[in-house]
Amino acid sequence: MRRLLAILGLFGIFLTPIPEAAFGGRAQAGQVGFASWYGKPHQGQKTASGERFSRGQLTAAHRSLPLGTKVKVTNLRTKQHVVVKINDRGPYGGGKGRIIDLSEAAAKRVGILARGTERVQVVVVENAS
């Protein structure tokens, strides 16, 4: 029982999002968690930035990074990566381990379209202007 609790505790640590404040406002070391994606049902809807969502653009939703920030998202299983602009807020569903929602185009680039979710690392590459 102790061993099981220890394993669950370690698993929880790896799924806990790292606040950007821990990196002086910039997630240089990265944030690890799960990415999901959103597409056609949201096409044309306004995002938190005021832009219209386009599933063909390389954009993403994040709960706390400033809108306009560019991040590199790396699929930890396949090592595929993409740079996206944060233009929306989320993810709001799917469980506590989710840290970013990718547009359909971005999800395709990192190879998570078919699986729906994947463990990723998110690293800020350019702060919002």
Give each language-model segment a name.
Residues 2-129:
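Secreted/periplasmic proteins
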